[in-house]
């Protein structure tokens, strides 16, 4: 969390105010924000956003993910479930945890988000890296722009097509 705390100045990050250890457990204290779940925000906007609305929300997120990876930290769970919107319309990223929770076949119970988890997260022999992050980011952006969550990564390995209506395709950048 100390490395994540170094990125407090990035608009998409929820500020970490303190980090401490007690009873062999690390804790972090975050700033209090009134947040709306991103999935609810999408529902209130007919299930999808236009590119002109989504772009300013997602650009700070891609910058933050790049900054995290430059410091050796991955989130590996970018999905509508880990995103929030502030009262003033800014996107916030939540859900940081150990990388072992973002992969099947590790000693910890995995926390994967169907449609946004990359294929390598289902196979313990693969390493998670920036490509894993890009998969989750683009799957979340696809969902945001089309209103449809991509198929689970295992299903997409069998059939990688992303079906969408002609009207949806015409709206995409």
For the regions a language model picked out, list residue spans one by one.
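AlphaC helix of the protein kinase catalytic domain
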Residues: 38-49
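Conserved protein kinase catalytic/activation segment
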Residues: 82-95
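AlphaC helix of the eukaryotic protein kinase fold
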Residues: 1-6
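Conserved short submotifs of the Hanks-type protein kinase catalytic core
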Residues: 23-37
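Protein kinase catalytic-loop region centered on the HRD/HxD motif
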Residues: 61-73
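Activation segment signature within eukaryotic-like protein kinase domains
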Residues: 57-58
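C-terminal lobe helix-coil module of Hanks-type protein kinase domains
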Residues: 115-173
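Activation-segment/catalytic-loop signature of the eukaryotic protein kinase fold
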Residues: 19
């Amino acid at each position: 969390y100390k490395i994540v705390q170094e990125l407090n100045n990035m608009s998409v990050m929820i500020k970490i105010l303190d980090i401490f250890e007690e009873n062999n457990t690390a804790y972090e204290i975050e700033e209090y924000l009134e947040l709306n779940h991103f999935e609810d925000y999408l529902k209130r906007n007919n299930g999808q956003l236009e590119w002109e609305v989504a772009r300013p929300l997602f650009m700070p997120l891609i910058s933050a993910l790049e900054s995290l990876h430059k410091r050796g930290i991955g989130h590996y769970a970018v999905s509508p479930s880990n995103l929030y919107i502030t009262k003033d319309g800014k996107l916030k990223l939540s859900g940081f945890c150990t990388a072992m929770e973002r992969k099947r076949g590790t000693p910890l119970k995995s926390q994967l988000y169907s449609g946004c988890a990359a294929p390598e997260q289902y196979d313990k022999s693969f390493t998670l890296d920036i490509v894993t992050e890009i998969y989750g980011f683009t799957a979340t952006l696809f969902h945001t722009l089309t209103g449809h969550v991509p198929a689970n990564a295992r299903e997409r390995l069998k059939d990688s097509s992303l079906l969408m209506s002609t009207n949806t395709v015409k709206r995409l950048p």
